[in-house]
Amino acid sequence: MALLLPLAVLLAACRPGHGFSGGCDTCGLRPVAYHYGGMRVVGGTEALHGSWPWIVSIQNPRFAGTGHMCGGSLITPQWVLSAAHCFGRPNYILQSRVVIGANDLTQLGQEVEVRSIRRAILHEYFNNKTMINDIALLELDRPVHCSYYIQLACVPDPSLRVSELTDCYVSGWGHMGMRSAAPTQTAEVLQEAKVHLLDLNLCNSSHWYDGVLHSHNLCAGYPQGGIDTCQGDSGGPLMCRDSSADYFWLVGVTSWGRGCGRAFRPGIYTSTQHFYNWILLQVRAAAHPTSRTWSHYMSTSSYHHGPNAVPTQPSVSDSCPFPAQKLREFFTGVQNLLQSLWGSKA
């Protein structure tokens, strides 16, 4: 039995519960970055390539330099989750492209995939003044291929206790300086920083955000400031490690803040858990007749039978560092062997 337990743990690590993944067999895993090193986002450090393999750069030629406009997270091979306020102008959508698997936006390697946007779905009740319902879905013109540098993010369903997650990070290519007036340099290399989830009531108190936050918001950063998301990080991920396994949940979408890195003004995020059903509804409604049904990509807390998703590519791009099918076969073989040995002793 001691031999079976580690195998069961590996199987569980290849398909987390409490949420959904969009194919490629798994979500929330970082094949290249098993050991997270030192923790620019404001006050952060450069991320190693592959550290956050679901983050994407949404680019528009109207923006200087690399054209980076906003971030986003790949949640299925053909859908990206981002912030609605990034797409206030229709021509931004038509002219934009999505870069997946990149780290340095000035040097896109062979592992990077680039897609056009087929459609953008902004929340129907998004308000760009109050920033309520600041969430959007982007359908890519064709699916991407999972690899060591391209993975899917896990969106938590309502059963996950997000407030109990303590190991959380933000990442993006946004401005890196603390902003009082004009923003400073935009990052070319992906930046990352560790943050704390802060109590929403505290963030909404009179000396902080003074009641302007909504129940679907998350608040993350540090009371003293210094580390924060900034302009250009919008739409990107707020990610927390699962409390019992080495995979990450996409718990928030970067929405807004007052300044960058200021005391008592932490970053404000849209809770993905709050909009879980909205996300499912939109992607189901947009499903193409030739595509897999959305239920193919679902995994909830009631899921008990192991992964049923089929990788979109051969094993060279299998997204799970421990291929689930092989593990199940090995696990079954060991179990049969032990049963045979026990039977011979009887």
From Swiss-Prot:
GO biological process, one term: acrosome reaction
Pfam families in the record: Trypsin
Enzymatic reactions: Preferential cleavage: Arg-|-Xaa, Lys-|-Xaa
Modifications the protein undergoes after translation, according to the UniProt entry: Glycosylated.
Catalytic activity, EC: 3.4.21.10
Disulfide bridge partners, by residue number: C24-C146, C27-C154, C70-C86, C168-C240, C203-C219, C230-C260
UniProt temperature dependence: Active between 20.0-37.0 degrees Celsius. Activity increases above 25 degrees Celsius.
InterPro entries to which the protein is assigned, alphabetical: Peptidase_S1_PA, Peptidase_S1_PA_chymotrypsin, Peptidase_S1A, Trypsin_dom, TRYPSIN_HIS, TRYPSIN_SER
Positions of the propeptide removed during maturation: 266-346
pH dependence of this protein's activity: Optimum pH is 8.0-8.5.
GO MF term (any one): serine-type endopeptidase activity
Active site per the UniProt annotation: H85 (charge relay system), D134 (charge relay system), S234 (charge relay system)
Regulation: Inhibited by aprotinin, ovomucoid, soybean trypsin inhibitor, benzamidine, p-aminobenzamidine, and zinc ions. Activity also inhibited by a Kazal-type proteinase inhibitor.
Glycosylation (residues): N128, N204
Ranges of residues in domain Peptidase S1: 41-284
UniProt KW keywords: Disulfide bond, Glycoprotein, Hydrolase, Protease, Serine protease, Signal, Zymogen
Signal peptide extent: 1-19
PANTHER family named in the record: ACROSIN, ACROSIN-RELATED
Other information: On the 2D-gel the determined pI of this protein is: 6.4.
Family assignment from sequence similarity: Belongs to the peptidase S1 family.
Subunit architecture: Heavy chain (catalytic) and a light chain linked by two disulfide bonds.
Protein name: Acrosin
Record organism: Meleagris gallopavo (Wild turkey)
Organism phylogeny: Eukaryota, Metazoa, Chordata, Craniata, Vertebrata
